[in-house]
Amino acid sequence: MTITLAELLESGVHFGHQARRWNPKMFPYIYAERNGIHIIDLVQTAQLLTEACEFVKKSAEEGKKFLFVGTKRQAASIIAQEAERCGAFYINQRWLGGILTNWFTIRTRVERLKDLELKEETGYLDKLPKKEAAGLRRELEKLKRNLNGIKNMKRLPDLVVIVDQKRETTAVQECRTLGIPIISILDTNCNPDLTDIAIPGNDDAIRSIKLIITKLTDSICEGSLGYDENNSDHE
């Protein structure tokens, strides 16, 4: 996986937050301050992103399962698109408390989603009184919005990729409680102590998020091919 400083620069990965909003623990990853904005050291970003890509590729080769998390507006569509591309699960609308720490309860909601989808597909809902059908369709839309990305998740993920550590605090806490490794884009207001694999970068700009998540996804896809080939060899 080749990552150049030019492409990081072009995507605005170097722009951090206002200096007054910084987390001092991010100091090692900050290159300078310009007009009250912290500038992230892209040499470190390139190195750490390369290492993260190698790690996810190796994990995918071992058949590990990934969960992508990013519920902010700028990240939502990228998270869904890239997760689907590499066969990962995702949460891109709202993190329901307990998705990981109370997985067995959440699974009942997932089963409810599947049940309602089946009833919609088979025309069962059309046979119900209009008011009842409308209520069930509203429930279906809500469940889809929140849980569609983990509909086929049968167990807890092995690795979680997070965009915006500050926003996804509950997801971070649940991962840490369960000892699930976190890979996270860390802006200058984040805490590197709360992640296992840090990628210093702008977690607000769409182009920055897309570049980093796409690089990780490409590596997962590459690793998954190796896993599929190894498995077919043993069949």
Curated annotation (Swiss-Prot):
Any one GO molecular function term: structural constituent of ribosome
UniProt entry keywords in alphabetical sequence: Chloroplast, Plastid, Ribonucleoprotein, Ribosomal protein
Any one cellular-component term (Gene Ontology): chloroplast
Keyword tRNA processing: no
Major localization listed first in the record, in broad terms: plastid
Transmembrane segments: none
Domain of life of the organism encoding this protein: Eukaryota
Pfam families linked: Ribosomal_S2
HAMAP family, per the entry: Ribosomal_uS2_B
PANTHER family with a match to the protein in the record: 30S RIBOSOMAL PROTEIN S2 PROKARYOTIC AND ORGANELLAR, SMALL RIBOSOMAL SUBUNIT PROTEIN US2M
Protein name per its UniProtKB record: Small ribosomal subunit protein uS2c
Lineage of origin: Eukaryota, Cryptophyceae, Pyrenomonadales, Geminigeraceae, Guillardia
